[in-house]
């Protein structure tokens, strides 16, 4: 845990107010800044124009943040969320702390991070940083000891907002389907009692579309419990159901909850346990995204109970399925470079004409 700066473990509005208000403001320490209409707003075009520049310079980012310090950028999701621009100096964060954050959580040890401000929604706030490739991260050591990649670039932040920042889903101000109704179930005893009393009850999940969570506790006592990594024990509380559950992976999963309320998914055949959320409320608001996508960097890259996050510095290269080649190259079986990748085309490839071709060239399909 980082303790040198309050914003590496921010958990209260008083800290946010003190750091993000200009010196001339006479705001009280606990004032809710979301309702302050006098704070200037930054247009998305200016923000995107700065961060899409390649190569991205830390000096350019610092100049932009300094120019628009104390201004806000409205985020698309959730409603009311915003980004307040502030430099690391304004937030009391040293470069050594930022470097330590990069070493402990980043996908690469030497990843450069630049502080651009704080994101705010209800009681949830987090430090926002930009990586050397333009990717955007959020960190709050109090809500979750992990670094979240909010988006791969500025366009992604404009589109997704805070959808990848899991602590938001546990907020009481987030009115997602099912989350507010079942929000009182904080522990495994509450959920287990409800599951037993209302067997087969269905709750719609936001993702995937058409999927439901069905309360279903196994009848045999020995089937109700499952050991999870770390020596803990979780109880089976239900499964996934509905037209949206088309994947064989989902049909084999059972939903578990441990004694502190964290929700997991585990396969019937004894496969890996995957952490879905830190609370039942967050699970009902997030759905089952964590079984397929993950944007959370744990400390020390300990990928226990979660999918590894791809590194933006070494992207996966997808080879094209169709190559446009000349006939003599096919006859000789020569290696041909296409999209910076090499392949050898067999001489028995079928030559077909495509309707989309406007140049009259033949398209060879293996």
From Swiss-Prot:
It holds the Pfam family US22. InterPro entries: US22-like (IPR003360). Belongs to the herpesviridae US22 family. This is Protein U1. It comes from Human herpesvirus 6A (strain Uganda-1102) (HHV-6 variant A).
């Amino acid at each position: 845990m980082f303790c040198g700066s309050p914003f590496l473990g921010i958990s209260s509005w008083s800290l946010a107010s003190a750091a993000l208000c200009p010196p001339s403001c006479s705001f009280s320490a606990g004032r809710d800044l979301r309702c302050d209409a006098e704070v200037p707003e930054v247009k998305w075009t200016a923000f995107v124009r700065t961060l899409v520049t390649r190569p991205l310079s830390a000096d350019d980012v610092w100049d932009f943040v300094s120019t628009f310090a104390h201004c806000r950028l409205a985020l698309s999701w959730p409603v009311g969320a915003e980004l307040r621009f502030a430099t690391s100096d304004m937030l009391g964060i040293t470069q050594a702390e930022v470097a330590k954050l990069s070493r402990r959580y980043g996908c690469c040890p030497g990843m450069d991070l630049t502080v651009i401000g704080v994101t705010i929604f209800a009681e949830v706030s987090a430090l926002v940083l930009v990586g050397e490739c333009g990717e955007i991260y959020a960190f709050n050591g109090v809500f979750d000891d992990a670094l979240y990649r909010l988006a791969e670039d500025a366009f992604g932040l404009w589109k997704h907002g805070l959808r990848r920042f899991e602590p938001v889903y546990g907020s009481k101000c987030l009115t997602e389907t099912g989350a507010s109704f079942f929000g009182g179930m904080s522990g495994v005893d509450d959920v287990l009692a409800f599951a037993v009393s209302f067997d087969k009850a269905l709750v719609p999940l936001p993702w995937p579309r058409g999927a439901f969570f069905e309360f279903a506790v196994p009848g045999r006592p020995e089937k109700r419990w499952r050991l999870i990594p770390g020596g803990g024990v979780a109880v089976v509380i239900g499964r996934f159901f509905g037209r949206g559950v088309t994947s064989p992976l989902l049909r084999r999963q059972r939903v578990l909850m441990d004694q502190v309320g964290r929700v997991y998914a585990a396969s019937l055949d004894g496969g890996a346990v995957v952490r879905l959320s830190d609370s039942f409320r967050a699970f009902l608001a997030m759905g089952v995204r964590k079984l397929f996508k993950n944007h959370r960097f744990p400390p020390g890259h300990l990928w226990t109970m979660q999918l590894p996050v791809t590194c933006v510095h070494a992207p996966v290269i997808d080879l094209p399925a169709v190559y446009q080649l000349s006939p003599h190259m096919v006859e000789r079986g020569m290696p041909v470079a296409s999209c910076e990748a090499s392949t050898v085309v067999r001489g028995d490839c079928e030559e077909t004409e495509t309707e989309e071709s406007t140049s009259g060239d033949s398209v060879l399909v293996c």
